[in-house]
Amino acid sequence: MVDAWGSELSQALSSIGPNSDILRQRLIVEFQFGPNQTLRFDKTLTGLDLDSGQQQRALLRRLEWAIGRLDIKKIEKSMPAVGMNIASCIKGTRSIDEVAAFPGKITIVGGKLRHHETPSFGASNHLASILIQAHTMNDAKTAIINLKPTMKDGKADLGKIKQTCEELGYSFAKCVKGKITGSHSRLDILLDEGDFGWEPSLYILAHNPLELIDRTHQICSQIGD
């Protein structure tokens, strides 16, 4: 029920767009056990009610929920040999210590996603650094995941990746050894083609961790065709 509700909310929020500010949030949950046995919780928050600590805790919960929504069947071919990670930040973040991610790496073991610890701030350096760079250019993007790009003749298939971006309406940019090249007002997909001793990586960016999962499934399905 929670997943279905979350999916509907995510789709509705995506249609509104990332530039809208929340003025009020109202959450109503009701359980009825019998004619005279009803539990009802009705909570209203304004957009100013969340302090920084609450925002950070909410972000960590979103990361936990996001990893639970990843479909292994859709992403297993895009799993990097070194494992993947998901990172996210609060809008306006400029320090990697303020970026939340999973300590270590997320891997597939026995057909299930495995991560050793719950997400925490300052747990990532490389992925957090790329997110900070992207967020500085395109501040609406606050979430990122790293994947293995589709390969051709031992190299990242640049043509296939660009074609996928065009078909899905996503912007495309490159990074070299973790440094985004050029200046961009919009960033959706980043490709690091790799080098000697440096594994090629595909980075997907989104407005939040939940949208990131939807984009990841969409792109992995498209590239895998």
Where are the regions a protein language model picked out?
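Conserved mixed alpha/beta catalytic, RNA-binding, or beta-rich assembly cores of soluble enzyme
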Residues: M1-S15, D21-R26, Q32-D225
